């Protein structure tokens, strides 16, 4: 089989600072009013009264969704979405295009390495540039799968299990249990600036959910980089009587010594997890060395599927789990091939967590959601990532080349 070359790469965006809030899509923080994801969740900005109540108040949704499409000489296309918006469009159209167009559709690792090397001087260890590279990488995998007529998970070597089981992230673990999920992860609402009173309030929330969900349903806390080691340690011990399964991302990404200390201090049997806001393989190697139990890369932010596969191998070599942050189909096709990912995350994007809504709604068509907390591998059997771009969304292409 002669594989075609890539003829075009294009980048669009939706949402972000120039749009009405609530666009959704790849920037899942960009939701409308009265949504749990924007309701007094503890953040690094919570210590400032003006930015305590709402994450959108400090601009969590200003980037918007980046959509990258790659087109082969034969007219077939692949695409992906991430969080990078208009600035990501500029990087794709004005810089990364030179490493993509003219390459064979199978040259994914070559393109990936060239994108990383060429942006190293302005990318740092993650953030906007890495989100953009991730989006390109995912689009390339989607195109390759569609050209050869295979789902991405089969390109990676095939499934190691028949289905993926999920826990749900949202404000209502009790509703998640009714929907068949294996656990529920709640955001914390208080931080170090709230003192011991904040610890008591979040521990009371866990206690209330434990009573509602029973003794065996998993309960976890997502702290979203909002704490310090002392506060996180005290919170973990306050929640231990309620069988908290893990405490997640308590500290900013680069506080590796803090994660090492927190793991030493955590109650016996309670896991410490992080990784959502780490980018690059090197940062995950350092994170793994802290001894945390689960690494949680976001495939749309860490360097794409190419990097996620490397992170999973790194974690496996150390006996650690890798459970990616959300990411819908882009994670599904990876984790069903990983032996060290026994479960995965589903992010509840309905406002009150009472219904199942696709994570990247409305930008993806045919995006699957779990049934009774699970997705069978047969659901993933369409070529590429198995979804299509919703071109009825108001796509903007601000740059070209």
Swiss-Prot record:
Full protein name: L-rhamnonate dehydratase
Gene: rhmD
Protein purpose: Catalyzes the dehydration of L-rhamnonate to 2-keto-3-deoxy-L-rhamnonate (KDR).
Keyword set, alphabetical order: Lyase, Magnesium, Metal-binding
Record GO biological process: amino acid catabolic process; carbohydrate catabolic process
Organism of provenance: Salmonella newport (strain SL254)
Record field: catalytic activity: L-rhamnonate = 2-dehydro-3-deoxy-L-rhamnonate + H2O
Keyword Cytoplasm: no
Signal sequence, renumbered to the chain: none
């Amino acid at each position: 089989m002669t594989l075609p070359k890539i003829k075009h790469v294009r980048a669009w965006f939706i949402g972000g600072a120039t749009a009405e809030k609530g666009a959704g899509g790849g920037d899942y923080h960009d939701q409308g009013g009265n949504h749990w994801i924007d309701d007094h969740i503890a953040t690094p900005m919570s210590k400032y009264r003006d930015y305590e109540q709402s994450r959108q108040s400090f601009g969590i949704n200003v980037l918007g969704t980046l959509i990258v499409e790659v087109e082969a000489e034969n007219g077939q296309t692949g695409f992906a979405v991430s969080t990078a918006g208009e600035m990501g469009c500029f990087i794709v159209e004005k810089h990364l295009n030179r490493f993509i167009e003219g390459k064979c559709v199978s040259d994914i690792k070559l393109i990936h390495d060239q994108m990383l090397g060429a942006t190293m001087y302005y990318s740092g260890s993650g953030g906007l540039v890495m989100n953009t590279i991730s989006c390109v990488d995912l689009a390339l995998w989607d195109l390759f799968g569609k050209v050869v007529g295979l789902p991405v998970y089969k390109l990676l070597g095939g499934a190691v299990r028949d289905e993926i089981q999920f826990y749900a992230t949202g404000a209502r673990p009790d509703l998640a249990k009714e929907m068949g999920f294996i656990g529920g992860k709640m955001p914390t609402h208080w931080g170090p600036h709230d003192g011991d009173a904040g610890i008591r309030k979040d521990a009371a929330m866990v206690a209330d959910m434990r009573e509602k969900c029973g003794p065996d349903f998993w309960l976890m806390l997502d702290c979203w980089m909002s704490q310090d080691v002392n506060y996180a340690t005290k919170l973990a011990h306050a929640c231990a009587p309620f069988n908290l399964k893990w405490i997640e991302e308590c500290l900013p990404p680069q506080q590796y010594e803090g994660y090492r200390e927190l793991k030493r201090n955590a109650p016996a049997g309670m896991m410490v997890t992080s990784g959502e806001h780490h980018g690059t393989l090197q940062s995950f190697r350092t994170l793994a060395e802290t001894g945390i139990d689960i690494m949680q890369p976001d495939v749309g932010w860490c360097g794409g599927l190419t990097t996620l596969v490397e992170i999973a191998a790194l974690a496996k070599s150390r006996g650690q789990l890798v459970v990616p942050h959300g990411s819908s189909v882009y994670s599904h096709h990876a984790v069903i091939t990983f032996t060290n990912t026994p479960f995965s995350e589903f992010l509840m994007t309905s406002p009150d967590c009472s219904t199942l809504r696709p994570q990247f709604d409305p930008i993806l068509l045919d995006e699957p959601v779990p049934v009774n907390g699970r997705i069978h591998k047969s659901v993933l059997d369409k070529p590429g990532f198995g979804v299509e771009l919703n071109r009825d969304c108001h796509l903007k292409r601000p740059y070209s080349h």
